[in-house]
Swiss-Prot record:
(6S)-5,6,7,8-tetrahydrofolate binds at G112, L113, L114, P115. This is Methionyl-tRNA formyltransferase. The gene is fmt. Attaches a formyl group to the free amino group of methionyl-tRNA(fMet). The formyl group appears to play a dual role in the initiator identity of N-formylmethionyl-tRNA by promoting its recognition by IF2 and preventing the misappropriation of this tRNA by the elongation apparatus. The keyword Protein biosynthesis applies.
Length: 316
């Protein structure tokens, strides 16, 4: 058990998984900071973040500031007398005044291999780009966006069918262990701080809903990587045109590669194979498995296709 006093800042499930690893390892988490509760999509009732729910269940003191620059909030942070802050997907760029509070500084777990994929969406962007390797990077934070010196790195292979959601789970699991290793090194005085090579930096900004739009005029492998990269959020979608009707939105929840090929127009629906719908790309064919027509529930792609009175064309 370490003697470090740790304050943890995080918000989504990814961060909750890492926090649980620290709690299970009996790290002395003296306080937790998370974002304010957000209203649910179909209700005005606010919902607590996964990190808040975990902190409450473990009876860990909790703060939810409206602004991280608020003097009263900063004073409360100082009262916790932390040795180190651990930041995991908190969701706000922190100012230097806050970063200077803990004795040994603030350490951030970034779900990507820095300096590549700096930003809010490293997991999604690396899958969309067709990468086969990802990992976590722990940095000692400065006021820049993911620009701090590197303390530790690990690697996670990206499976050929892995979605962003699945990669996030894998990275959260291994990320907790990487933070533990870093805390041990901080206490032992052996932690390293290696400057990033900014010449190799790339950006991974947050994805918009519009970026979920599938562009069929691309190789099937690229289309498949795009669908996996935006799953589960913001989600892949296309437009379908049923004869005599206006174009409508079709969510794509699940897809896979098809071995067959041929000469077809991108976006052309080739028919049903088993439970799936075959769609042509610029090179190759993709199987749509689970889809969601606009305003309807998830369904098998075959059932969607059979429910159309006449021919269907996917627009790209």
């Amino acid at each position: 058990m370490l003697n470090l006093r740790v304050v943890y800042l995080g918000t989504p499930q990814f961060a909750a998984t890492v926090l649980e690893t620290l709690v299970d390892a009996r790290i002395h988490v003296v306080g937790v900071v998370t974002r304010a509760d957000k209203p649910q999509k179909r209700s005005s009732k606010p919902i607590a973040s996964p990190v808040k729910q975990l902190a409450l269940s473990k009876n860990i003191p909790l703060l939810q500031p409206t602004k991280t620059t608020d003097p009263a909030f900063l004073a409360q942070l100082r009262e916790w007398q932390a040795d180190v802050f651990v930041v995991v997907a908190y969701g706000v760029i922190l100012k230097q005044e806050l970063l200077d509070i803990p004795k040994y500084g603030c350490y951030n777990l970034h779900a990507g291999l820095l300096p590549a994929y700096r930003g809010a969406a490293p997991i999604q962007r690396c899958i969309i780009a067709g990468e086969t390797l990802s990992g976590n990077t722990v940095i000692r934070m400065d006021a820049g966006m993911d620009t701090g010196d590197i303390a530790n790195v690990n690697h996670v292979a990206i499976g050929e069918d892995m979605t962003a959601g699945e990669l996030a789970e894998a990275l959260a699991g291994s990320g907790g262990e990487l933070i533990l290793k870093t805390l041990q090194e901080i206490e032992a005085g052996t932690v390293r701080h290696i400057p990033q090579d900014s010449a190799k930096a790339t950006l991974a900004p947050k994805l918009t809903k519009e970026e979920g739009l599938v562009k069929w005029d691309a190789p099937a492998s690229q289309v498949y990587a795009h669908i996996r990269g935006v799953s589960p959020a913001p989600g892949a979608w296309t437009r379908f045109l049923s004869q005599g009707k206006e174009p409508r939105r079709l969510g794509i929840l699940s897809a896979r590669m098809e071995s067959s090929s041929g000469s077809h127009s991108p976006g052309e629906v080739l028919g049903v194979s088993g439970e799936d719908l075959l769609v042509a790309c610029r090179q190759g064919v993709l199987r749509l498995c689970i889809v969601q027509p606009e305003g309807k529930v998830f369904m098998k792609a075959k059932d969607f296709f059979n429910g159309q009175s006449r021919s269907v064309a996917l627009l790209f």
